[in-house]
A protein has these predicted regions:
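Beta-strand-connecting loop/turn residues
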Residues: 32, 77-79, 104-105
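Short, low-complexity N-terminal intrinsically disordered segments enriched in polar/charged residues
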Residues: 1-32, 48
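Short beta-strand edge/turn micro-motifs at domain boundaries
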Residues: 92-117
Length: 117
């Protein structure tokens, strides 16, 4: 499968959790030691901190959240993707994600940096 499509599948799973208000599900697409940097709050280091940040975000509701992977690439077990996100008519931005493939062959996010438009 094309790597960009693999990334989109991972992001689609994340969006599904987000729309349901499932912060733990959102955090599950990240590595346990992942780092997330966002203009919407302080840096979140580790899956627990990422889940805590998402608890606040999903409580605000996001039935219309969309994320589209616009480019992606990989070399061996290391990959990246750039995605555009939107939640409604006012909130939008980009994310740069570094992904690693685990021993099980599954890709997860190890580093994420969000930028608001």
């Amino acid at each position: 499968m094309d790597f960009q499509k693999e990334c989109q599948q991972l992001i689609d799973r994340y969006v599904s959790y987000y729309r349901k208000g499932d912060a733990a599900g959102c955090a599950s697409v990240y590595r346990p030691e992942a780092e997330m940097y966002s203009p919407f709050g302080p840096p979140a280091i580790g899956r627990r901190a990422i889940e805590a940040a998402h608890k606040e975000w999903v409580s605000e509701g996001a039935d219309h959240k969309k994320i589209n992977v616009v480019s992606a690439g990989r070399s061996g077990g290391l990959g990246w993707c750039i995605a555009r996100f939107s939640e409604d008519t006012t909130d939008s931005g980009s994310s740069m994600n570094i992904l690693t493939r685990g021993p099980d062959g599954c890709w997860k996010i190890s580093h994420c940096s969000l930028t608001e438009n």
